[in-house]
Regions:
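Short, Lys/Arg-rich, polar N-terminal cytosolic tail immediately upstream
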Residues: 1-8
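The first (N-terminal) embedded transmembrane alpha-helix
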Residues: 10-31
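Core segments of transmembrane alpha-helices
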Residues: 19, 82-93, 113, 132-135
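Short, hydrophobic transmembrane alpha-helix segments
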Residues: 28-40
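Alpha-helical transmembrane segments
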Residues: 38-52, 110
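Membrane-water interface of transmembrane alpha-helices
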Residues: 53-64
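Juxtamembrane helix-capping/reentrant segments at transmembrane boundaries
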Residues: 67-84
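Membrane-embedded catalytic cores of phosphoryl/pyrophosphoryl-handling enzymes
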Residues: 101-200
Length: 200
C-alpha cells in the first residue's frame, strides 16, 4: 500500500503541467541577463506552455467529460493534446514575432514537435506522457545548463516504474514515451544549433 502511495506521489510530482512551470522559470533566470527580461518572457512561456493546456483539462474535468486530471483513457487524451499543439504553436509564433531569444523559439518549436508526434501515436496507442516530459526536460536542462544535468535522465526509470506500478501504462509505453522525447528534443535543439552549447 505504501509503495502504491509513493508511486502515485511520483506520478503527480512529475506531471508535465507542474514541472514545466519550474522549468520555464529556472531556464529563463539562467539564460536571460536581467530581471526585466525574465519578467517579460516567463509569463508568456507559462501561459502557452502550461496554463492553457492545463486549464482545458480542468474544463473537461469540471464538465465531467473526463474523470481524472491525468486523463487515463487514451481516447480522452486527444482533445487536450490538440489544444496543447495549438498553444505551443501560438507560443512559438508569438516568440518569433516579438523576436524573443532563440532558445525560447527552440523550446516551443521542440515542444510542439514532440506533442504532435504524441498526438499521432495516441490516436491508436497509449504512449506515456510522463516519461516523455521528464525525458524532454532532462535533455532541455542539458542543452541550457550543461552536461551534468544529463543525470536527470536517472529520473526516467523512477517515473516509468511509478506509471507501471499504478497500472496506468505498460513497460513498453513508458519506454516509448521516453525514447520519443529523446529523439524529438535532440532533433529540435539541433535544428536550432543549440545541442553543441555543451559537450560531454
Amino acid at each position: 500500500m505504501k509503495i502504491n502511495k509513493f508511486a502515485k506521489a511520483i506520478s503527480y510530482i512529475f506531471d508535465g503541467s507542474y514541472i514545466s512551470i519550474v522549468a520555464y522559470l529556472s531556464i529563463n533566470i539562467f539564460m536571460l541577463k536581467t530581471a526585466r527580461e525574465v519578467a517579460i518572457w516567463t509569463p508568456i512561456c507559462i501561459l502557452f506552455g502550461s496554463i492553457m493546456p492545463f486549464v482545458f483539462v480542468v474544463f473537461l474535468y469540471k464538465k465531467k467529460i473526463i474523470t481524472d486530471l491525468h486523463v487515463p483513457k487514451r481516447e480522452d487524451r486527444l482533445k487536450p493534446l490538440i489544444v496543447s499543439n495549438i498553444s505551443y504553436l501560438l507560443g512559438y509564433f508569438i516568440f518569433y514575432i516579438l523576436k524573443a531569444p532563440i532558445y525560447l523559439r527552440a523550446l516551443f518549436f521542440t515542444s510542439f514537435l514532440t506533442t504532435v508526434l504524441l498526438t499521432l501515436i495516441t490516436s491508436f496507442w497509449k504512449i506515456s506522457f510522463h516519461t516523455s516530459w521528464i525525458t524532454f526536460t532532462s535533455i532541455t536542462y542539458y542543452v541550457f545548463f550543461g552536461k551534468w544535468f544529463l543525470f536527470m535522465l536517472l529520473l526516467v526509470p523512477l517515473v516509468g516504474w511509478a506509471r507501471v506500478k499504478i497500472k496506468r501504462h505498460t513497460i513498453g509505453q513508458v519506454i516509448a514515451g521516453s525514447l520519443l522525447a529523446f529523439i524529438t528534443a535532440s532533433f529540435g535543439y539541433s535544428f536550432f544549433h543549440l545541442m553543441n552549447m555543451y559537450r560531454i
